[in-house]
């Protein structure tokens, strides 16, 4: 702001000085007398310019222009020359005007116009000087992390427009760059006039309305609210039957194919509550393979994966539909090794359901498993994981004995579950090492398993 104001003062001073000179000429001297004065001025131009050049820049011209006094010829001459020091072509224009017949008046007008142009040029230069160091703007070519568009890397362009204005503009730019990154999935709207609360216990007509809304809408937010409402109502046995009789299972299950992980999670939760009912399991079995495939390929340890595992666990509590998932045994054991604490517990509950069905024993022990699975028999794991893995080993060992598979050991490869649990001997050593575990419950379970070997 200081440079712009200084340039404006210089321009104003030059214009005022030129106008004052012209007024002095018109009012104080006559035409003929001023012609003589101007001729004398032309003759002494060289000597006067030498004296004037020792004065510094525009500040001297401002002081001279604004401080004009009618004291004599010697005062007027340096004032005119000061205005001309940055524009050597002014004298030539004045001379050309006089030779054309305009006389001293034409010279003065030419001088006035030239000074005016010089002032405008100085003002423009000052404005440019004040705008070189400009605002910090967002570079559109550099993407902002997590954002959909624009950039967050500052570049210099534009005008400063003063200290306060530039401070405000910088503050706005910073506030834009600190916005939360846009999400991959559709943004959930905060308000929607849904006819019911998600925790309301609905009657059959109300459930029909919710199912109709879910069937007709493509809005992710409405789908989520409807699925949560149906899932909460499916926790009650009377509504489990009502939703099935209203044809709600296919309407809910069609959302398994959606790409939105939130919608898939809510879909699995609703189907999980419905699967507690045996008749509903007969409807859900159509989609169990699709649920299993999606659960195995989705992001590891995600909420969608946990919801899918819970649904598969409920569907395998009975022996009716376990054969539909036998092709996924290797994936289950791989997930048991790779998953986090909660995934390990949930997948072990699922596998234990298969071990309690003797008919599934051969397929189960013949599948390939990672050798690192033996690390689960380590005392560093907590009680729940140790109890589940010991139960898994106990059930498989009992089934091998009951089904007479011990004599068929040649049928199984060295990478199979049969070889890892029965033939390698490493598993038995690990279990014996747990006999001195600090947890009494784990110690009792270990002793029970060892007595059956």
Curated annotation (Swiss-Prot):
GO terms for cellular component: mitochondrial outer membrane. Residues 167-177 have a biased composition (Basic residues). Pfam families: Arm_2 (PF04826). Residues 1-6 are mitochondrial intermembrane. Residues 140-182 are annotated as: Disordered. Residues 30-453 are cytoplasmic. It is found in: Mitochondrion; Mitochondrion outer membrane. The chain crosses the membrane at residues 7-29. It comes from the Eukaryota. Residues 1-6, 26-36 are annotated as: Mitochondrion outer membrane (MOM)-targeting sequence. Keywords: Membrane, Mitochondrion, Mitochondrion outer membrane, Repeat, Signal-anchor, Transmembrane, Transmembrane helix. ARM repeats lie at residues 195-235, 237-276, 358-398, 415-453. Gene3D superfamilies: Leucine-rich Repeat Variant (1.25.10.10). InterPro entries: ARM-like, ARM-rpt_dom, ARM-type_fold, Armadillo, Armcx_regulator. It is a single-pass membrane protein. Its main location: mitochondrion. SUPFAM superfamilies: ARM repeat. Interacts with MIRO1. Regulates mitochondrial transport during axon regeneration. Increases the proportion of motile mitochondria by recruiting stationary mitochondria into the motile pool. Enhances mitochondria movement and neurite growth in both adult axons and embryonic neurons. Promotes neuronal survival and axon regeneration after nerve injury. May link mitochondria to the Trak1-kinesin motor complex via its interaction with MIRO1. Belongs to the eutherian X-chromosome-specific Armcx family. This is Armadillo repeat-containing X-linked protein 1. It comes from Pongo abelii.
